[in-house]
């Protein structure tokens, strides 16, 4: 019941995806070949959300792995969990997108997209009651950004009523992988605003900070970063995979988290994060988890929620946690930090509980926040975009693949609209005079 089909596109998406499958295979008691050797009935009860049962007690992920070059795929196949995936579900090209969004979205990616959709269709047909799709990708490159967004819009066309969740690695403020990142990211956000239902924003710099500051790793590897992301991904879907007192699924999450359809970009966090040596010195309690997960240092996207306000939040607790304690803590957070929550959505923290903690922890919590401060992130990318676009730098790579400058202008203005929508709701109060709204009404109709 309630299956999720997982897609991973591009190098970043495949690496995060591989870490994610490693994490949840462990939670469900599967070894690296997908054979069950767990101890608890609960691990099997809702295995079908992410896994198909094959013959011989083997479980196969409902995952579609996509890339425009074979390199990353080979790495996944050679990795510790390479034997887990169904070989037909690897779909790859040979040419690569070369960090060019247009190649991923219009030329190279468009040639491969039908093969991917065939695999997606086959996975969807193997489901009892498909709940939706989740896709891991980055927004700065060519394949994950360009082809990832193409897949999202194609899947949207074919499955209009299913949820579409994306785990998107957004460009970091200081660390840039490629010069054309602002272009790729802006073009991607332009697509995500229209086609995704919930986008969890992650960025490498924030992850580096968490690794250095909290986990005390002197030089974190991508493996460490991916481990953090997979912890969050596992937390977001935990309620689907294990029975709990207060369940939530992708759709419930969206209903509770998205007050206006375009504003579906979330910040995520995870607690407890402690350095490996310090585990034994701490007892984890609900107040401590709450404090850590509402800590700006714990957010996996580089925007500080103290510069904005929360429209909505969701807190997912795992482990032996008392319902009452959670509710008290949430009330506590809201009353102490009321200035960080918009007052026109009362009680805007949704909670979910699940009895089974992640491996190696007694209890944990996952935080998802829809904060207006995420606009900082878009603003930053938008400014970099404008700086390059004004001089038409690097544009020939995109126009050469058949793109039009108009598209860039549209993407830019869509992103600016998004920023100003966040700003508008950040400033909106509950007791504003009626007259103000009457003047503002025409704004709504422009879209």
Curated annotation (Swiss-Prot):
GTP binds at residues 11, 69, 138, 142-144, 204, 226. It comes from Hapsidospora chrysogena. Belongs to the tubulin family. PANTHER family: TUBULIN. It comes from the Eukaryota. This is Tubulin beta chain. It is found in: Cytoplasm, Cytoskeleton. Its cofactor is Mg(2+). SUPFAM superfamilies: Tubulin C-terminal domain-like (SSF55307), Tubulin nucleotide-binding domain-like (SSF52490). Mg(2+) binds at residue 69. One of its GO terms (cellular component) is microtubule. Keywords: Cytoplasm, Cytoskeleton, GTP-binding, Magnesium, Metal-binding, Microtubule, Nucleotide-binding.
